[in-house]
């Protein structure tokens, strides 16, 4: 089946149809229409898979996809234009330009945590740049994945875009085929496998991964607003967000006050019993719940931690000053557990931060510009928010992506178009007479020419 779909898509791409801007816009408009048609079903599926509140599903999934489609439709023609480039003195009389062109057949493997948004946003970029797409959504969010297939089937012909459902064996099988581009969102561990498979065929790829995202809080901040924004970013989608604050590094002078404010904001957001809150999500499955429970077993100073396996529920949990060698401080948590670690000075801070790889996200709460600038200059990361969390993801004019262990490449808006485009460099020369120095035999004395060129 997979071979047949790939052959169809290859033939369709070679027909040049996808290179038409009008075709791309028409395709995306049809997708937008069907998303709006099935919007309530999308909410229902996200509720079944992750217990997402309808408002959260709209703001963090559906709205972002619709916004991305509209942004592409508005800008495709401009982005696709041939771009004139200033000629070099060495290419006298030439016309230099760059032509963006689609790669061809693209494979997208998407995760379960934001199953609608993270499946569709990369697809929009690929289609908008003129590629064909095969999408493999996660089997861990089955209701949403099945609905995505239904929406895609009503929006595109199979030879243009197709969704293939299945488990990790299907994903492995797909990776054995030759692609012109691979886009993967998921764990660093699986990302390395994808990179290895792509390297065997010299296939370009983007990896959107994760990491331990630090959240630094210094003593200058207003604690009420700081706690509110941290709680929102950490416990959104039950902590299952790749850019969620993974742990807090707080100045020891305000540790107890911040913890009290965080406890208060958790109760304000989700009530005294978050299990009864319609605004609090669920862990995706029992396997991940067991993993999260294992992080808590050896911790002594815990606030929260209640678990209900039947309901896939883990209470919003604070772990106070875990050891830096504990698993909870060495592994991306990806759940509603928030370690709070104290520091006394900038040296302490650097010692703790240096233990981790470059994260996907970085958060600093401070009014001290010098402190903020020092941190931003010293550490490398995918993206950051100052005095807030998550919001760097919302601006489609900013590239979104990691570095090193947290990812390779970036997307969103024009950055998605660039990701899924190859830029051909062209130099066109007229048949004017060339400078005689270009061709052999070369002069032994070229000091005059050398002096001129060295000044340019």
Which role does the model predict for each range below?
Residues 89-225:
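Rossmann-like NAD(P) dinucleotide-binding subdomain of oxidoreductase/dehydrogenase enzymes
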Residues 46, 145-148, 174, 194, ...:
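Hydrophobic packing residues within well-ordered alpha-helices of enzyme cores
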Residues 13, 17, 32-35, 39, ...:
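Structural signal for hydrophobic packing residues in well-ordered secondary-structure cores
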Residues 24, 69, 130, 161, ...:
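Residue-level signal for inorganic ion chemistry
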Residues 2, 21, 39, 223, ...:
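Residues at or immediately preceding the N-termini of alpha-helices
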Residues 20, 216, 314-456:
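Conserved C-terminal structural/oligomerization subdomain of aldehyde/semialdehyde dehydrogenase
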Residues 1-97:
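N-terminal Rossmann-like NAD(P)+-binding subdomain of aldehyde/semialdehyde dehydrogenases
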Residues 156, 189-324, 386, 448, ...:
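ALDH superfamily catalytic-core signature
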């Amino acid at each position: 089946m997979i071979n047949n779909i790939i052959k169809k898509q290859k033939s369709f791409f070679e027909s040049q149809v996808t290179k038409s801007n009008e075709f791309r816009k028409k395709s995306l408009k049809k997708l937008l229409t069907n998303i709006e048609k099935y919007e309530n079903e999308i909410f229902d599926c996200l509720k079944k898979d992750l217990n997402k509140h309808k408002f959260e599903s709209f703001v963090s999934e559906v709205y972002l996809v619709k916004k991305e489609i509209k942004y592409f439709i508005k800008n495709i023609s401009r982005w696709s234009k041939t771009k004139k480039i200033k000629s070099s003195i060495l290419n006298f009389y030439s016309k230099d330009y760059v032509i963006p062109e689609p790669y061809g057949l693209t494979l997208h493997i998407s995760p379960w945590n934001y199953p609608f948004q993270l499946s569709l946003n990369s697809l929009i970029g690929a289609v908008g740049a003129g590629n064909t797409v095969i999408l493999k959504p996660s089997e861990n969010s089955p209701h949403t994945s099945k609905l995505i297939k239904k929406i895609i089937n009503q929006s595109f012909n199979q030879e243009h875009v197709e969704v293939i459902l299945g488990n990790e064996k299907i994903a492995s099988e797909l990776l054995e085929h030759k692609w012109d581009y691979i886009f993967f969102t998921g764990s660093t561990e699986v990302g390395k496998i994808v990179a290895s498979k792509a390297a065997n065929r010299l296939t370009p790829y983007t990896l959107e991964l994760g990491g331990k995202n630090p959240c630094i809080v210094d003593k200058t901040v207003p604690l009420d607003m700081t706690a509110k924004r941290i709680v929102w970013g950490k416990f959104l989608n039950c902590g299952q967000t790749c850019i969620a604050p993974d742990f807090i590094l707080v100045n020891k002078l305000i540790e107890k006050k911040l913890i009290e404010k965080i406890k208060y904001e958790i109760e304000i957001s989700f009530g005294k019993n978050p299990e009864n809150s319609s605004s609090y999500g669920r862990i995706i499955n029992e396997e991940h719940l067991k993993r999260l429970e294992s992080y808590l077993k050896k911790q002594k100073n815990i606030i929260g931690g209640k678990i209900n396996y039947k309901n896939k529920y883990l209470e919003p949990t604070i772990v106070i000053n875990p050891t830096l060698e504990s698993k909870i401080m060495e592994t991306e948590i990806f759940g509603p557990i928030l370690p709070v670690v104290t520091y006394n000075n900038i040296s302490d801070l650097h010692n703790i931060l240096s233990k981790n790889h470059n994260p996907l996200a970085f958060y600093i709460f401070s009014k001290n510009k010098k402190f903020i600038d020092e941190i931003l200059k010293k550490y490398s990361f995918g993206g950051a928010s100052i005095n807030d969390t998550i919001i760097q993801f919302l601006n489609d004019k900013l590239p979104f992506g990691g570095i090193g262990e947290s990812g390779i490449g970036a997307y969103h808006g024009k950055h998605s178009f660039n990701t899924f485009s190859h830029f051909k460099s062209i130099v066109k020369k007229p048949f004017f007479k060339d400078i005689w120095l270009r061709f052999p035999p070369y002069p032994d004395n070229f000091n005059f020419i050398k002096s001129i060129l060295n000044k340019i």
